[in-house]
């Protein structure tokens, strides 16, 4: 939770960026780590269609500075908007959302994707609450070419409408209807989303809301080695998918 403020800081320094976050089991290739990245703003379908989406929202909570949390009613999957101008307000509003999201017993944070960008002096963060890592159509590694399978594991960009398929065949066969079905499948259902909205209202209206602080969690430092040479050999200790093939063991 405490790292969310980095999104606001980045957008303050680089207002033309779009920043996105993939939580664990929400788009990263390995389910036990997360993505925090940025790219050019204004290219995602979520953003190109924003004039339509922003006209039909239901406000859940507004603070004294006019910063707010809203439901984006017309988006294909459940989505919440945090609209802020200050770093403090942004962090506090996200805290209300974070506290309201369901969290599995063995997880250390709720499943979610976040897409954030600037609109003038406003900071917009869209939070996509998740309940599944991958849709049922995602192929088993033992049968990657199974009929009807689609190698789509939605992350923040996919949830924002830019669905990326590693396989050309999946790209050609994917329809708008199937894409929406996939996004809804990995998102909270209507009942779960209604519960989140209710909890946000309850949390935001508690007298102690302003003092709620999530404990900081120290993130491990990961060092990745980079090697070069005319010939590189390494071994994989499990099965991995690369270029539509299952690979394992010694690689050259």
Regions found by a protein language model. Give the residues of each.
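Conserved, single-site charged/polar hotspot
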Residues: 210-252
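HIT superfamily nucleotide-processing domains
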Residues: 1-212
